[in-house]
Amino acid sequence: MNNNDRLIRLRYALDIKENDMIEMFKLGGIQVTKEEVKKMLVNPDKFEEDEEVDPDSYIIVDNTVLISFLNGLITFKRGKKDSGKNEPPKVEEPLKNSLSINNEMLKKVKIALSLTSDDLLDIFYDVDVDISKSELSALLRKEGHRNYKVCLDRYARNFLKGLALHFRD
């Protein structure tokens, strides 16, 4: 699963409109146009091998762009942090391990939607994924912690599918 796919699935699950996505990117520290958002919502992996594809018809979303969007989602859903300073949002450093993007997505969506660990367990349960509290805790830990566990695409896909079931009813 690539970042374009994650963005597409998250947008569907939370029923986010394009204008709201532009605002979320802005809150996350990245300026994008409506056309750029549309190009980000194209998954380049879905094209057939023999199909001629114009490289200008899509934009590959990297980890930094996805993390900025998720930070903007948090700010959009929960409001700005009261730090007393009026600073522009800073773009986070890229992840050391590209596999941990699923962990970051899980953590940031949990924060944005004010979900508890029990809510996450319910979401996974609704899509028939058996995950214990300790496994979930390991997925939510900081990379480098001794009990940290990489969130595989299977968990990320099912989490986004469960979110869609919860929020699109």
Map each language-model feature to its residues.
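Flavin-dependent oxidoreductase catalytic cores
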Residues: 91, 103-109, 117, 141-148
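Extracellular/lumenal glycan-associated surfaces
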Residues: 12-25, 68-77, 117-123, 158-167
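Short, amphipathic alpha-helical "recognition" segments used to contact nucleic acids or chromatin
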Residues: 1-14, 100-112
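Positively charged, low-complexity terminal tracts
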Residues: 94-95, 99, 103, 124-125, ...
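Non-catalytic, well-ordered alpha-helical scaffold segments
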Residues: 63-67, 103, 118, 153, ...
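Short, well-ordered coil↔helix boundary/capping segments
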Residues: 100-103, 111-115, 130, 149-154
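A cross-kingdom feature marking solvent-exposed beta-strand/loop segments within repeated
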Residues: 1-8, 16-62, 122-123, 129-156
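Intrinsic disorder/low-complexity detector
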Residues: 62-102, 163, 169
